[in-house]
Swiss-Prot record:
It is found in: Periplasm. Part of an ATP-binding cassette (ABC) transport system involved in metal import. Binds a metal with high affinity and specificity and delivers it to the membrane permease for translocation into the cytoplasm. Disulfide bonds: none annotated. Gene3D superfamilies: Nitrogenase molybdenum iron protein domain. The keyword Manganese does not apply. GO terms for cellular component: periplasmic space. Belongs to the bacterial solute-binding protein 9 family. This is Putative metal-binding protein CP_0211. The lineage of its organism: Bacteria, Pseudomonadati, Chlamydiota, Chlamydiia, Chlamydiales.
Length: 278
């Protein structure tokens, strides 16, 4: 009995300590999980990093519940990327906001989804080149906000930049072996990756997040025939059902990818390997 009481006491104490530790740290908000990974690589334990949308939801259609808005008000700093749900955050948050699309070479024009209030492709993290710019923005912002940790941030930022350079070289090697340069995807998430590594992206789902129309189906069929595409990439949480049905209709192989996976460095290599094996 004594051992049980001691165990319960130690468990409660550790939970209390963890809670106080989180409360004592500055809260840094990021819009999606890949940036949680990046900020944590740079800031280590100096900040508590909170992803507004986890990779269990589609950020394009996400709606913040009232309880989450209350939690977000603890934020001391917010790195945003241009998603539609950020408008709700903007109206309810007073913390410093930093747009990570700044200084990035953006793909302009009609966005991938009509939920967006931007006129550019917001999937900027799916490119090592873009990530290098964003890492520099994160390091500069954190160093100014929390100057007592600036040396740590700058050191970790340099390591991350080197890792991104190495990743870019690895992806170039992997993708150089690709035989198919035309990629069919359920949702247009890979514009920056395709631009950087010489692929062409063809999408099933257009900007409306609704079932493909007969016109869309005809367009997809033309792309399949013209470019001899034999596989379709299905994305987690976006357009899976309708795209899977089309893949079955056209007797195509399906591959699953998650553009919002938290470890973006590993994910980019996974994307490269997947594209090159189609």
């Amino acid at each position: 009995m004594h051992k049980v009481i001691v165990f319960i006491f130690l468990t409660l104490y550790s939970l209390k300590s963890y809670g106080n530790d989180v409360i004592d740290k500055p809260h840094v908000l990021v819009s999606i999980a890949p940036y949680k990974f990046l900020v944590e690589q740079i800031a280590e334990e100096t900040c508590f990093v909170y992803a507004i949308v986890t990779n269990h939801y589609d950020p394009h259609t996400y709606e913040l519940p009232p309880q989450q808005i209350k939690e977000l008000r603890q934020g001391d700093l917010w790195f945003r990327i241009g998603e539609a749900f950020e408008k709700t955050c903007e109206r309810n948050l007073t913390c410093q906001q930093v747009d990570l699309s700044q200084n990035v070479s953006l793909i302009q024009g009609k966005p991938c989804c009509n939920q967006h209030t931007t006129n550019y492709d917001t999937h900027t993290w799916l490119s090592p080149k873009n990530l290098k710019v964003q890492v520099e923005t994160i390091v500069t912002t954190l160093s100014k906000k929390y100057p007592q940790h600036a040396t740590l941030y700058q050191s970790n930022g340099e390591k991350l930049l080197l890792a991104l350079d190495q990743l870019n070289e690895e992806i170039l090697t992997i993708t150089s072996k690709a035989k198919q340069r035309h990629i069919l995807v359920s949702h247009g998430a890979f514009g920056y990756f395709c631009r950087d590594y010489n692929f062409s992206q063809h999408t099933i789902e257009k900007s409306s997040h609704v079932e493909p129309s007969p016109k869309d189906v005809a367009r997809v069929f033309r792309d399949i025939e013209q470019y001899k595409i034999s596989s379709v990439i299905l994305l987690e949480y976006s357009g899976r059902r309708s795209s899977a049905m089309l893949a079955d209709r056209f007797h195509m192989h399906t591959v699953n990818l998650d553009p919002y996976a938290e470890n973006v460095l590993v994910n980019l290599k996974t994307i490269a390997t997947t594209f090159s094996s189609l």
